[in-house]
Amino acid sequence: MSAQEQGINEVPTCHGGLENLDAEHDYWIDDIEGSLPSDLVGTFVRNGPGRQRIGNKPYGHWFDGDGMLSQFTFSGSQVHFRNRYIRTPKYIEETSEQKILYRGFGTQIPGGFLKNMFRFPANPANTSIVYHGSKFLALNEGGRPWEVEPGSLDTVGEYDYEGSLKGKSFSAHGKV
């Protein structure tokens, strides 16, 4: 029986703490113990790696996991949850092929050193989320921001500040 079949995470840097969440969800949370403050109204969104393997092949480092947004919307006494993967080329193509196709921070594509040597790591858009310049942006240090729609969390696409962002990287750890 494989480690995955036993429920063991094969990525040594994860120490068993991170597992895939393959499904996207959209539902009202019914099971709340106690009550929520009536003036708790708003939305909290977080970003993080939602997938640590593709098919049976684990990524080499948890930094390479595909970005997943998790959104909690509070409306007085109710909470709604929605999660969505950010549809980067890496996510779309690896999901379709069910194999690793992009080099990452700690993940090599098949083919050895020469195949990986001049390839920059893919941008999994998995580090943070900010609202800046009227845009909701998913960030990663290894690439440009990815714009997503507030509320639906649908991916709009890579955002380059209307051509003014010339580089291929962007800080994902902004301070306010």
Regions found by a protein language model. Give the residues of each.
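Beta-propeller domains
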Residues: 1-176
